[in-house]
């Protein structure tokens, strides 16, 4: 009778009450139980009061109760029916893992962005290179074209220049061929005797028809007879070629160019006359005179040094850009594009 009454009494008690009674019989406090089970005092109190914390999973709660029962020497089989009521097993809700898929989509989007960025960068670099190459090629073609034109013009001018002296020297005029002794005599008297004879002025029209303008100037300078007649006998007579030479006067509009490398250039003056067009070699120099302003086209500005009116001309802007120099030098030496 006593055993059945005790069994009925144990069944009437809840799990928490049985654990509390067993703890009190062993003389343990809630603090001591919490320290031995490595739990909070509040968790031990909730177990003894048959409370199931909302933030605690049923699996952990059942484990705590079993550990508590072993500590106070209560068989676990006696607590199983009460555990089913106090801490029923609940199906845990497993949240779908979205972080991996989101990271994968983000990584894919970043990959497309990087690919597009590199594509744009390659396109920009390609366009820049193509633009530079076309500009460089156009400059080279322009230089080649100007050089070809200048060489063709120089060849045509040289052919014309060679044909003119041949025609004038080989043409036979009856007037000139009929009187060779007279022309020889007059030149002999002009160059060897201090006094000029009387027939010399009569020969001038024939000489003007044959000789060049420089020789005509020499003859006119040698015609004054009284001056030559008053020359002393001991003085040496000057040749007619030296008598016609005058001291050159420096032209204020002279254009001086010194070349440090091979360079093609073209120079024209205000009248449109082409003073020079062609290739100049290294260590060469060029002195040009004409009517200002001058128009210059220089294929390699870095290879030439220009002085105009005794002052150097600045070509640094063309050298920096490595372009064909096109400039105009006016009377005030202000180069303009």
From Swiss-Prot:
Residues 30-49 bind DNA. Its main location: membrane. Residues 19-71 form the HTH cro/C1-type domain. Residues 145-167, 208-218 have a biased composition (Polar residues). GO terms for biological process: regulation of cell shape. The chain crosses the membrane at residues 112-132. The keyword Cell membrane applies. Residues 168-207, 219-236 have a biased composition (Low complexity). It is found in: Cell inner membrane. One of its GO terms (cellular component) is plasma membrane. GO terms for molecular function: DNA binding. Residues 133-337 are periplasmic. Keywords: Cell inner membrane, Cell membrane, Cell shape, DNA-binding, Membrane, Signal-anchor, Transmembrane, Transmembrane helix. Residues 145-236 are annotated as: Disordered. Residues 1-111 are cytoplasmic. SUPFAM superfamilies: lambda repressor-like DNA-binding domains. Disulfide bonds: none annotated. The keyword Ribonucleoprotein does not apply. The helix-turn-helix (HTH) motif in the cytoplasmic domain of the N-terminus is involved in the formation of spirals to maintain the rigid rod shape. As this protein is anchored in the cytoplasmic membrane, the HTH motif may contribute to protein-protein interactions to form the RodZ helix, which is localized beneath the cytoplasmic membrane. The C-terminal domain may be critical for determination of the rod shape by probably interacting with enzymes required for synthesis of the peptidoglycan layer, including PBPs in the periplasm. Cytoskeletal protein that is involved in cell-shape control through regulation of the length of the long axis. This is Cytoskeleton protein RodZ. It comes from Escherichia coli O139:H28 (strain E24377A / ETEC). The lineage of its organism: Bacteria, Pseudomonadati, Pseudomonadota, Gammaproteobacteria, Enterobacterales.
